[in-house]
């Protein structure tokens, strides 16, 4: 017999070497949804402790970007890993469906409401458009491998959800948090509506930067305040600095800080009042060389001193405000109560009325002297001309600065006082309660707590009313004269909510007030406003979590969104839940950063660095996208590029190749009949299983702490170091050459089987498609579940027995020795002394500490070092230099004997058996005899 190929146990599996994910994943998805995988996961988890991750609804408009992919994949990894950790994890995806972006899109398609089509038809067009957008985004989320109740998502435009949003408004009213008032709010001229804090973006804008004189009504009074009677010469004025000249027509006061020192200063040929700390800066800005301090006083002493308006025929007082600082300007602040939050608050204390000069369209009303009918930004130059004309303009230049813009139109916005509905931060101690609740939440990363704490501490009252068509209406009736809410408001809200439940928000617009109010309809009218969309999404703790049966009345464990949501969804949810339930709506809040390219730049078409999620899964597969997400530290900016994705592909191939090796070497293994008990297994195999147990414990802990990059790193260490470059390399000889049903081989296959069962579960939350594929190739079991996703982490792993002399420390030491031997073998290969490692005979000269470890393996040490022969001698007898590993010296020679064509080991006994004259004695025992015996490796 000369052909011994059929006597070898060569690896064999149908599991392909190449993932070909882009092609295979859609078929797997079809199988998942044909067999209702999500419901199978839910059924398998029935009765277990619940973990609820409430999905923050993306906006139902436009195609998905990588930020969406990061968000949904992180959520999916959490839900799948929590299932594996023993939780029941219902996941209900949702969408935010009302609001301005959809209105604008629909306006472009069908025109504005009440122009070409009625408001009712316009709302239906918005509903249809949003539904279409949801379907498109849903298909993409599913393609990413995200499991959830996609057939029954929550939409904020669902009739039932709209009704619950109205009921939440009722609770806000019931608890005394709602009031109507005129306050400055962010106002978009293009939207003709107020904006929420989260709808404001800051972009650079060029604006006029001006210093303006307000002439003293009585110079003598001012001189006296500064103890400077008769000092200096020329006109005397208070100087303010502003970048919004258009707000000067609405000026009603000058604010100073009571605690600051102010000085009367001779600047050239005039006298001006400035904060002492800013005198030098203003002198430099005005480029005036002559300066003399005429007198000093505190802001407190200047209270109610009056100055002429720079171009109107009335005077304005100096008032005191804590918001005045010396960070810039002059230390005297132009105060227009209509156009600034601080201005409004401080003016209210002094009973100063708002001017009300700017209309909804951003133009000055017809009664405004000099500027009637002009747009506010157009009026800037006109105001400058007027200031020059009256001699009030001290200095003009143009500066580029950060300025608030509308998130949708990308155009500058203004602060404008309008009658709106607010949730008061101070009423019923809402701010104090919210700040207290923040402390009860686990924030991941931890800096999120300080961030939202500061935002809540400083935020103004929440303007929840909008002047829009497509939104949940503020279904209230107010008195025609007093603007007071109808006394039966709560009862009426519930009646309207029931109508909306059946017919949607159009039920409100179609409602005749007399139907509900009777005679009161003559003295009460409908509120025409809609709710801020952040009220919609912010109330989903009530409209979704408290209503959906799968959540069973449990409170939410986690909210997970991008870090911009501290001021968005996290904030609105916290405000509403605290206002209605006196508690935060979440126990944990996890935030991730934004996607940037490898140079840290934002994605933009102009830079050509935009990567679309579909581009990735169509080319590389969704598993590569998922692995990239899991591999990053999501707490900061998340870098992505084709190079980074290719790197994720390399990581993927290492994991896939490990899985393929495991499966190929389980060929012919039947766990029911071939499983070897741990105590009978060969030492190295027991150690390999214990390595898997250690890895699993670390992986479970990392999953539990949402440290997915740690999971990937631990997976790679296990696959590349502990398995790939050590264990799996060593066992090839035993796996391929020993008798097929020998203990030596079955012990090895038992280890491989345990490791495979564990590994497939480790990767399932991240590499979901690949895990599903591996699951189908594992050895059959009568009780094997159809899908890996219904399973918990594998509980069949075991550690080394305490009595086992060859413990983990032993094998870790051997791993180091083997790495050093490999280094020396590589040098011998480079020197052309040997080719493969099996052509070598290695003499290991070892110290007294290391030598006993090596000698414990006896003849089996050669299998660990993968050489044909190994001799161990005392280090003192070494005739070669000591190696890099202390206590070792290694000599490499060509192996004795001939190469066995079956096992490729060199042996001196080839030819001693006439019947098998070509192979070594070990192979003869494995082919003809009872099979070689192994104890250690």
Curated annotation (Swiss-Prot):
Zn(2+) binds at residues 900, 903, 920, 923. Keywords: Aminoacyl-tRNA synthetase, ATP-binding, Cytoplasm, Ligase, Metal-binding, Nucleotide-binding, Protein biosynthesis, Zinc. ATP binds at residue 605. A motif ('HIGH' region) lies at residues 58-68. InterPro entries: aa-tRNA-synth_I_CS, aa-tRNA-synth_Ia, Anticodon_Ile_BEm, Ile-tRNA-ligase, Ile-tRNA-ligase_type1, Ile-tRNA_ligase, M/V/L/I-tRNA-synth_anticd-bd, Rossmann-like_a/b/a_fold. Its EC number is 6.1.1.5. Catalyzes the attachment of isoleucine to tRNA(Ile). As IleRS can inadvertently accommodate and process structurally similar amino acids such as valine, to avoid such errors it has two additional distinct tRNA(Ile)-dependent editing activities. One activity is designated as 'pretransfer' editing and involves the hydrolysis of activated Val-AMP. The other activity is designated 'posttransfer' editing and involves deacylation of mischarged Val-tRNA(Ile). It comes from Histophilus somni (strain 2336). Coiled coil: none annotated. One of its GO terms (cellular component) is cytosol. A motif ('KMSKS' region) lies at residues 602-606. Gene3D superfamilies: 1.10.730.20, HUPs. Pfam families: Anticodon_1, tRNA-synt_1, zf-FPG_IleRS. GO terms for molecular function: aminoacyl-tRNA deacylase activity; ATP binding; isoleucine-tRNA ligase activity; tRNA binding; zinc ion binding. Monomer. This is Isoleucine--tRNA ligase. Its cofactor is Zn(2+). GO terms for biological process: isoleucyl-tRNA aminoacylation. Binds 1 zinc ion per subunit.
